[in-house]
Swiss-Prot record:
Coiled coil: none
Organism listed in the record: Arabidopsis thaliana (Mouse-ear cress)
Record protein name field: Origin of replication complex subunit 1A
Similarity comment: family membership: Belongs to the ORC1 family.
Tissues expressed in: Follow a cell-cycle regulation with a peak at the G1/S-phase. Mostly expressed in siliques, flowers and flower buds, and, to a lower extent, in roots, leaves and stems.
SMART domains to which the protein is assigned, alphabetical: AAA, BAH, PHD
InterPro entries reported in the protein's UniProt record: AAA+_ATPase, AAA_lid_10, ATPase_AAA_core, BAH_dom, BAH_sf, Cdc6_C, ORC1/CDC6, P-loop_NTPase
């Protein structure tokens, strides 16, 4: 990553598209002043809401403005000067047609179908360039956008000083060179510094006030401005403190009806607005390009800023105060990052064009566009109009690929109670609260706080185990979410949190790369990552610009990291024992006795602190389902109780209970639609739950398990028993055969022999009940159940020929 704006002399930035007339290492003092150096906020700023799609309400005043009879027209390279909006035009438009409130038109809530009206689509004329308020804007430009809707545009301009005040003398001189601090981004005159500087030094430069703070001294004497002097903040300071927005212009158009100019903005985010917050590797001027778009009026655009890639950013030492770095894109929906694909600037002038999809809502033929007097006088030809509306060479992301317009009747459809219940009971839906696990969550919270609150933070490990579907992972994530809020409030010391799921790793060794990326933000190979992590946790060396903060490492599916020599688990669990590691490890697995199955040197580090999540009983399952359905009247209480008791008797898996209730809601919805009965007055009854249970527990694969031979049932029971013992979904034929031999010997059954067992395993593989490797591997053949172990237990638990199978299920 490119280094920050180090030791640069700031240069005055004119509000044009590209910086011109710049002086090398000199600057006629541009923007930024305040008593304290500008700092980015320490707390996360809420993400932009849907109200951002509505532009600021412009105060046009009450005095009428006389319009000239005829306006002059200029046309240079398809650059058009928009006319000023006046009160007369707005009043005339209101008298002709009732305007829709922007807050209503952009509301994310689907209106009732009876309230919707079919309105004619607004006609638009698109441009590549527009001159607005004596400033030229073009597709692909980066601009500042007002964030406060009720802000006065005149005040905004007055608060944007063209020449920045010095942080020491609080004066602005047009003939004095200034230098910027790489830590606080404050500007200083060279002769105001102590000792004064004769020229701008090379490399990073930090002001004397930041040096005192970094040295650990609490008493820092910061100069105060003279009495009566008004301190004004620059656009850069407002953006980094979340008082302004930055955006990239994707489209430019004018509404033909009212003559208002609009832009399609693609938003930038500062690191504080992402889910991870500001990390140690983030630069002061770093922004993220998001996949969040909005349509706003040109009145909300203030002026240009300049967002550059790392290569250009490293050469922008003298390009002014409005230069920022963007190296990564940020997905606001998934909270993920990826590198920005750098597009060549010359693509727009190339002969090859992008064949973009025609958009129904914006493309119109020449006959449909009714040009006003200004356009008719200009006599724009069809070829020129097409050139102005095309987006030649502009392709910023794949946000519209594969999209299909949703019919109006679907948008206007109001969800019934059953439809709301089906959406709420989905496993992907995050619950508002987590019932029945308050005791476990309190224990996890106390463990983490005790590990990170002490100044002498020593590493600790906690092993969390329990059968699947008992809320282990979601409980830990809920605790971390609550601790994050306490960190923002200042009641808990800051920490670094890294979450890893073992099933998402290509190999156990890749966990080193994931941990290193979570700490440094860079992705390297696992060998180099292991070396750096050993230096970090064993020797106490920093990774990059890392702060001295504890690290909390959450590893889900910990048993996946078990290798032949168990070196991966040993390294991870050995790091917390080092004096300067400040590492807290939370391991989650399904097996209770996993530490006892590992090497003694690993179990001694892992098995000290344990927390067990037992299966849910029927009352807890009933409370979980009722909490999900709070405010939705779709189920009878007896139906919820019936589903809870049925699942609690088999496995106590909350996910299975939610799936049964969701399927019961689908059955009830189908039944009501088939009988033409209003769904508003009907609820899910016990019969619907019974149908869902029959579908789930009497599926074809369960019927096959019930009908297999006696030895096949013993073979499946041995696989389930082996799964419960080891916690590993995958096992070998050798282990299963040993378990079958032990089960047969204990219960007086004759052991069939290895060859017969191998044939039974292959037969179950042909039925797809078991996933297995080719039989030629014999004893080394790997086996795995193709269905949940609960289904096997349900199919074989009540077997009359072999009643003792229930003891192993």
């Amino acid at each position: 990553m490119a280094s920050s704006l180090s030791s640069k002399a700031k240069t005055f930035k004119s509000p044009t598209k590209t910086p011109t007339k710049m002086y090398r290492k000199s600057y006629l003092s541009p923007s930024s002043t305040s008593l304290t150096p500008p700092q980015t906020p320490e707390t996360l700023t809420p993400l932009r809401r849907s109200s951002r799609h509505v532009s600021r309400k412009i105060n046009l005043g009450n005095d009428p403005i006389d319009l000239p009879g005829k306006e002059s027209v200029e046309e240079i390279n398809l650059i058009r000067k928009p006319r000023k909006r006046t009160n007369d035009i707005v009043v005339a438009e209101k008298s002709k047609k009732k305007k829709i409130d922007p807050e209503v038109s952009f509301s994310p809530v689907s209106p009732i179908r009876s309230e919707t009206k079919k309105t004619k689509k607004k006609k638009r004329v698109y441009y590549n360039k527009v001159e607005f308020d004596e400033t030229e804007f073009e597709i692909g430009d980066d601009v500042y956008v007002k964030r406060t809707e009720d802000a006065n545009p005149d005040e905004e301009e007055e608060e944007d000083p063209e020449i920045e005040d010095c942080q020491i003398c609080f004066k602005s001189h047009t003939n004095t060179i200034m230098i910027e601090c790489d830590d606080c981004l404050g500007g200083f005159h060279l002769n105001c510094l102590k000792p004064p500087l004769k020229e701008v030094p090379e490399g990073d430069w930090i002001c004397q006030f930041c040096e005192v703070k970094k040295s650990g001294q609490t008493l820092v004497v910061v100069p105060k401005p003279p009495e009566g002097k008004k301190l004004a903040r620059t656009m850069k300071e407002k953006l980094l403190s979340s008082d302004l927005w930055a955006a990239r212009i994707e489209k430019l158009w004018k509404e033909v009806d009212d003559g208002v100019y609009w832009i399609r903005a693609r938003w930038y985010m500062i690191p504080e607005e992402t889910v991870l917050g500001r990390q140690r590797h983030n630069l002061k001027r770093e922004l993220y390009l998001t996949n969040d778009f909005a349509d706003i009026e040109m009145e909300c655009v203030l002026r240009h800023c300049f967002v550059k890639c790392p290569k250009e950013f490293s050469k922008a030492s003298n390009d002014g105060d409005d230069v920022f770095l963007c190296e990564y894109e940020y997905d606001v929906h998934w909270g993920s990052f990826k590198r920005v694909a750098e597009l060549a600037d010359g693509d727009e002038d190339s002969d090859q064009e992008w064949n973009g999809r025609k958009e129904e809502e914006i493309d119109y033929s020449d006959e449909e566009i009714e040009f006003d007097d200004e356009e008719s006088v200009r006599g724009v030809s069809k070829s020129k109009r097409g050139g102005a509306n095309s987006r030649k060479g502009r392709f910023f992301g794949l946000e519209k690929v594969g999209m299909k317009r949703i019919p109006e009747h679907v948008r206007c459809h109001k969800q019934s109670e059953l439809e709301k219940a089906k959406a709420t009971l989905l496993l992907a839906t995050r619950p508002k609260s987590l019932p029945c696990r308050s005791k476990e969550m309190e224990e996890i919270t106390a463990f983490i706080k005790g590990s990170i609150s002490d100044d002498q933070c020593l590493g600790r490990c906690m092993y969390i185990h329990g059968v699947p579907g008992t809320g282990k992972t979601i409980s830990v994530l809920s605790v971390m979410k609550n601790l994050k809020a306490e960190v923002e409030a200042g009641s808990v010391s800051p920490y670094c949190f890294v979450e890893i799921n073992g099933l998402k790793l290509a190999s156990p060794e890749n966990i080193y790369s994931v941990i290193y990326e979570g700490l440094s933000g860079h992705r390297v190979g696992w060998k180099k990552a292991l070396q750096s992590l050993n230096e970090r946790f064993a020797e106490g060396k920093k990774i990059g610009k890392e702060n001295e903060k504890p690290c909390i490492l959450l590893i889900d599916e910990l048993d996946v990291l078990v290798t032949r020599n168990q070196s991966v688990l040993y390294n991870i669990l050995d790091w917390p024992t080092k004096p300067n590691s400040k590492l807290v490890v939370l391991g989650i697995a399904n097996t209770m006795d996993l530490p006892e199955k590992l090497l003694p040197r690993i179990s001694s580090r892992m098995g000290i602190q344990r927390l067990c999540f037992g299966p849910y009983n029927h009352r807890q399952l009933q409370e979980i389902i009722s909490t999900r359905l709070e405010g939705i009247n779709a189920f009878e209480k007896t139906a919820i109780e019936f589903a809870s008791r049925k699942v609690a008797a088999i496995s106590g898996d909350a996910r299975r209970a939610l799936e049964i209730c969701r399927r019961a809601a689908e059955v009830a919805d189908y039944r009501l639609k088939k009988s033409n009965i209003s769904a508003k007055s009907q609820l899910v009854i016990m019969a619907d739950v019974e149908v869902a249970i029959q579908e789930m527990f009497q599926a074809p694969h369960i019927q096959v398990m019930k009908s297999v031979s006696k030895l096949s049932r013993i073979f499946l029971t041995a696989m389930v028993h082996e799964l419960y013992k080891t916690g590993m979904a995958e096992t070998s034929f050798d282990r299963v055969a040993t378990t079958v031999s032990s089960i047969c010997l204990t219960n007086g059954e004759a052991f069939p022999g290895w060859d017969i067992l191998l044939k039974i395993g292959c037969d179950l593989g042909e039925c797809r009940i078991v996933l297995c490797e080719p039989g030629e591997k014999h004893r080394l053949q790997k086996l795995q159940l193709n269905f949940p172990s609960d289904d096997v237990a349900f199919a074989l638990k009540d077997n009359k020929d072999l009643p003792w199978l229930a003891n192993y299920l």
